[in-house]
């Protein structure tokens, strides 16, 4: 497997609830006064799904009301459709749910994914750049909709070395860090700055992760 070959996410389920029970809406973070319908997805990669959910908010009148990674990742899933994450979008209009789900699927199939950081793909890296944030990840990062952001993820030591390299390689600031362990035992960070700067930071992050994989005990 070539280094930095795409590891495409697998979409495991896409379902709609056009008229959800108010109790269910409330339980999953929706507001029955504003939301009537839900769209649900499960995927075997969590971070690309967070990106896809955010993308949906830019193209459809939907809110991301629930999105959680599952403990220990997709290799330890509770069932064949569980994957690594459940994401839920909500709207008052079933057609908006449909539009949002279409964006989510398209983003997962053609945009956001992990990459192999070594020859056998046992180390994965997510050096993703969002040119314009939607309403979901902007809140999570403490940024404004429309701002660029680098969304960086890797295993613990690789991510730590990579984040240091990214911060030194470009004029970016650390908007939020997720030290290990996360639910999936990775580590992550959001970096803010001008688009070309976050792109440079993401590239430096990926390169550093690859180098750590090649030389894990370098002095």
Model-inferred region functions:
Residues 2-45, 68-85, 91-92, 112-219:
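A structural signal for small-residue-enriched, beta-sheet-centric alpha/beta enzyme cores
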Residues 49-59:
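N-terminal low-complexity, intrinsically disordered segments
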Residues 97-107, 201-208:
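Short amphipathic alpha-helices in soluble, non-transmembrane regions
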Residues 59-68, 99, 105, 174, ...:
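Tubulin/FtsZ superfamily GTPase core signature
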Residues 49-51, 73-76, 96-97:
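Short active-site-adjacent helix-start/loop capping segments
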């Amino acid at each position: 497997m070539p280094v930095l070959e795409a590891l495409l996410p697998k979409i495991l389920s896409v379902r709609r609830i056009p008229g959800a029970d108010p109790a269910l809406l409330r339980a999953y973070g929706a507001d029955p006064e504003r939301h009537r319908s839900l769209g649900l997805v499960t995927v075997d990669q969590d971070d690309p799904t967070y990106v896809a959910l955010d993308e949906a908010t830019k193209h459809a009148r939907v809110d991301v009301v629930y999105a959680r990674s599952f403990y220990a990742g997709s290799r330890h899933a509770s069932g064949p459709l569980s994957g690594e994450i459940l994401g839920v979008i909500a709207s008052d209009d079933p057609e908006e749910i449909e539009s949002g789900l279409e964006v989510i699927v398209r983003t997962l199939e053609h945009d956001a994914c992990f990459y192999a950081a070594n020859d056998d793909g046992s180390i994965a890296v997510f050096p993703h750049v969002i040119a314009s944030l939607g309403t979901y990840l902007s809140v999570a990062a403490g940024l404004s909709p429309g701002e660029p952001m680098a969304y960086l993820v890797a295993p613990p030591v690789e991510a730590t070395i990579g984040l240091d390299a990214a911060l030194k390689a470009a004029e970016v600031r650390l908007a939020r860090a997720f030290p290990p362990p996360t639910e999936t035992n990775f580590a992550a960070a959001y970096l803010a700055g001008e688009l070309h700067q976050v792109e440079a930071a993401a590239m430096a992050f990926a390169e550093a992760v690859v180098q750590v994989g090649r030389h894990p005990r370098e002095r």
